A protein has these predicted regions:
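Interfacial loop-to-helix junctions that mark the boundaries of transmembrane helices
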Residues: 1-6, 27-35, 56-69, 171-180, ...
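Hydrophobic transmembrane alpha-helices that form the pore/transport pathway of multi-pass ion
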Residues: 96-150
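C-terminal ends of transmembrane helices
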Residues: 15-28, 78-93, 126-129, 192-198, ...
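Transmembrane alpha-helix boundary signature
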Residues: 25, 44-67, 76-94, 107-120
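Transmembrane helical segments that form the transport core of multi-pass membrane transport proteins
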Residues: 230-299
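Hydrophobic core segments of alpha-helical transmembrane domains in multi-pass membrane transport
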Residues: 9-20, 39-50, 75-83, 182-194, ...
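Juxtamembrane and boundary regions of transmembrane helices in multi-pass small-molecule transporters
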Residues: 134, 153-154, 172-221
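Cytoplasmic-side transmembrane-helix entry/capping segments in multi-pass membrane proteins
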Residues: 29-40, 65, 69, 91-103, ...
Length: 299
């Protein structure tokens, strides 16, 4: 029961993140750090009372070192590398084009993460629908499909799968969700197409037309060499799950070697290798990419 009660601050923090930007956006913008501190203290203080300061410190450090650190480094790497790739084109935001774009982005999310796919595709999606007035549904489905649902096939895609992988779940285990993903993707695409087609007809009836500079389809991708760095990040994540099983990374008792932070909390050598590879990939991405690309991405 006590363990369940200690979950309340986490649920409260998630609700704040989801609701406050909509209800009190200005307050949230200024005080989100304070909200995180308050909810964290609402966990830490009762935990100290129930379990003692030592166990609470160990629990908090375990979460920071073995969960949060590698997770945030992965997001940082995907965000940086994806920000150095730009997708340009003269596509017009019709229902069919938007649906195909959403389908592509949904499948891409499991390859470069929901963060990476969203970073790469949100600007082209906004640009090709900039001529339209009735378009709120486009970004809603973008968030549903590309920023959330699409990452369900690999630990690269979604944070919960990454944490499962860090706890020993096989990297490709979640591929069995592929039929479910396809079913839901098709269902959502049908719903989206019907809604978008109705709104599209309203825009056309109001005299709105896409501004396409030249006939045909002209799509240009810059910064493609960054795919190498995305692959490096994927390899780093896979290594973090496979290296701990190698004898060279274990002591005589079979424990994974690393730097002890506090009691049983340890930053393992495989985790350090993963972090180093991801940070190196992000650094090389910045060093080898023209700044113009980042400017185009508003990055």
């Amino acid at each position: 029961m006590n363990s369940l009660l200690l979950c309340i601050p986490f649920a409260g923090l998630l609700l704040c993140i989801a609701v406050m930007p909509l209800v009190k956006p200005e307050w949230w913008e200024k005080h989100q750090a304070l909200a995180v501190i308050v909810w964290s203290l609402l966990f830490i203080i009762p935990s100290i009372v129930l379990n003692g300061a030592g166990e609470t410190t160990e629990t908090v450090l375990e979460c920071i070192v073995n969960d949060y650190l590698t997770f945030i480094v992965l997001l940082f790497g995907l965000f940086c590398v994806s920000g150095n790739i730009t997708l340009e084109g003269n596509l017009a935001g019709s229902p069919a084009v938007n649906a195909l774009f959403l389908a592509f982005g949904t499948l891409l999310s499991s390859c470069i993460g929901t963060t990476g796919a969203s970073m790469l595709l949100v600007r082209p999606m906004i640009k090709m629908n900039s001529w339209r007035k009735n378009k709120a549904q486009i970004m809603i489905f973008f968030i549903f499909m590309i920023s959330n649902m699409g990452g369900c096939l690999t630990p690269i895609g979604d944070p919960p799968l990454l944490m499962g992988f860090m706890r020993g779940v096989p990297f490709f285990w979640s591929l069995h969700l592929f039929p479910i993903l396809i079913f839901n993707m098709i269902l959502l695409l049908i719903i989206f197409y019907l809604i978008d087609k109705k709104q599209y007809r309203k825009d056309i009836a109001n005299g709105l037309r896409p501004d396409i500079s030249k006939p045909g389809v002209d799509i240009k991708v810059e910064g493609l060499h960054n795919i190498v760095f995305l692959v490096a990040i994927v390899v780093a994540v896979i290594l973090s799950g496979t290296l701990p099983s190698l004898p060279m990374f274990q002591d005589a008792a079979g424990n994974v070697l690393g730097i002890t932070i506090y009691k049983s909390v340890k930053l393992t050598f495989p985790a350090m290798i993963e972090i180093a590879i991801i940070l190196l990939a992000a650094l090389l991405s910045f060093k080898t990419t023209n700044e113009k690309i980042r400017t185009q991405n508003h990055f």
